Swiss-Prot record:
Belongs to the SHMT family. The lineage of its organism: Bacteria, Bacillati, Bacillota, Clostridia, Eubacteriales. Homodimer. It is found in: Cytoplasm. This is Serine hydroxymethyltransferase. Catalyzes the reversible interconversion of serine and glycine with tetrahydrofolate (THF) serving as the one-carbon carrier. This reaction serves as the major source of one-carbon groups required for the biosynthesis of purines, thymidylate, methionine, and other important biomolecules. Also exhibits THF-independent aldolase activity toward beta-hydroxyamino acids, producing glycine and aldehydes, via a retro-aldol mechanism. Pathway: One-carbon metabolism; tetrahydrofolate interconversion; Amino-acid biosynthesis; glycine biosynthesis; glycine from L-serine: step 1/1. Coiled coil: none annotated. GO terms for biological process: glycine biosynthetic process from serine; tetrahydrofolate interconversion.
Length: 413
């Protein structure tokens, strides 16, 4: 990007941006929730739309001069509805967390009981963690995975639902590598007359391309972020049945937000447009191929994968048999140029600041053009670094840098 003005006005900040640019360029990015946006997305984000206040919704604003940003928001909403075949879309949430908060506030009262996936089993902070607003404002109870299969225990979920009769069941996850059976969860919701909400932030790209079954036909509400597999700007969105549209919109504004970020909404429109193209489907198919190959190679090196493998874009790895914690593995791999995050595993025995595992994903490296052969090399680099962690790993770091040079960010720019 052109930083001519920033170079003159704030070289100190520009230096920080340049260092981050270099880190992204020469590191293998395996954090499952991260991706690289297109230059088009960044151009929209950096546009003068950031100057415009637009409280309210298209054609019902509290400010004048909104006729063109109305067009932008309408375009984003229509593209999102088309992408997921949804009845209503709200593109104003600043984040996935705020999208979730708005759904809760739209139909529930403070203190209502909600059933969500346990954070340590793969859920999310906003699905009831006691340190999060969700756990503080609502009476969350949790379901998890089966100890043997490490996949969602739907029998346990149903049993807990029947015993506690929550007002809402939340599904979706931040560290779950398998297909989620939304139809089965809908049946449980119907049995207890509960709302069904799905947080598809991680798998939105897989859903959009038909690789993962869509929650939209089953759920009353579907929330997502726009910056993970959707490869857009950092932000959130909500899909819902038309009958909940007014309640959801009111929960966002004036409920929990003021003016929407019109430059971000424009960038969301760009990414939704990109996701509607055929090449995006090919990209998502390659993401899954890459993840499966990476998983199999890691298994060949003796790594234990939670649930034995993956159906989506991520892998959850138990490092116990490698005699290294998630925290130490994250630091070690970062030192050679592989970025991962420490992660709790089901039935975790260590602190969430230490963890027994790491979570990795392939959306970002697949965006760069990495394919199956590169996945085999990544598995080798990870295994070698962990097995030889007391040795000098400078040669591994150099090999990683050379691979990154072969697949530059925005190579077609």
């Amino acid at each position: 990007m052109d930083f001519t003005n920033l170079k003159n006005t704030d070289p100190e900040l520009l230096d920080m941006i340049k260092k981050e640019e270099e880190r992204q360029e020469y590191n293998i990015e395996l954090i499952a929730s991260e991706n690289f946006t297109s230059l088009s997305v960044m151009e929209a984000m950096g546009s003068l739309l950031t100057n415009k206040y637009a409280e309210g919704y298209p054609h019902k604003r509290y400010y004048g001069g909104c006729e063109f940003v109305d067009e932008v928001e309408d375009l984003a909403r229509e593209r999102l509805k088309k992408l997921f075949v949804a009845e209503h879309a709200n593109v104003q949430p600043h984040s996935g967390s705020q999208a979730n908060m708005a759904v809760y506030m739209s139909v529930l009262q403070t203190g209502d009981t909600i059933l969500g996936m346990d954070l340590s089993h793969g859920g999310h902070l906003t699905h009831g963690s006691p340190v999060n607003f969700s756990g503080k404002l609502y009476n969350f109870i949790s379901y998890g995975v089966d100890k043997e299969t490490e996949t969602i225990d739907y029998d346990q979920l149903k049993k807990i639902a029947l015993e506690n009769r929550p007002k809402m069941i939340v599904s979706g996850a931040s560290a779950y590598p398998r297909i989620i059976d939304f139809e089965k969860i809908r049946e449980i919701c119907d049995e207890i007359d509960a709302y069904m909400m799905v947080d598809m932030a991680h798998i939105a790209g897989l859903v959009a391309t038909g690789i993962h079954p869509s929650p939209v036909p089953y759920a009353d509400f579907v929330t997502t972020t726009t910056h993970k597999t959707l490869r857009g700007p950092r932000g959130g969105a909500i899909l819902c049945k038309e009958k909940y549209a007014k309640a959801v919109d009111k929960a966002i504004f004036p409920g929990i937000q003021g003016g929407p970020l019109m430059h971000t909404i424009a960038a969301k429109a760009v990414c939704f447009g990109e996701a509607l193209r055929e090449d995006y489907k090919e990209y998502m198919q390659q993401v899954v191929k890459n993840t499966k190959v990476l998983g199999e190679e890691l298994k060949n090196y003796g790594f234990r994968l939670i649930s034995g493998g993956t159906d989506n874009h991520l892998l959850l790895i138990d490092l116990t048999n490698k005699n290294i914690t998630g925290k130490d593995a994250e630091k070690l791999l970062d030192s050679v140029g592989i970025t991962v995050n420490k992660n709790t595993i089901p039935f975790e025995t260590l602190s969430p600041f230490i963890t027994s595992g790491i979570r990795i994903g392939t959306p970002a490296v697949t965006t760069r053009g990495f394919k199956e052969e590169e996945m085999k090399k990544i598995a080798y680099f990870m295994n070698y670094s962990i097995e030889h962690r007391e040795e000098n790993l400078s040669q591994i770091k150099e090999q990683i840098k050379e691979i990154c040079k072969k697949y530059p960010l925005h190579q077609n720019a």
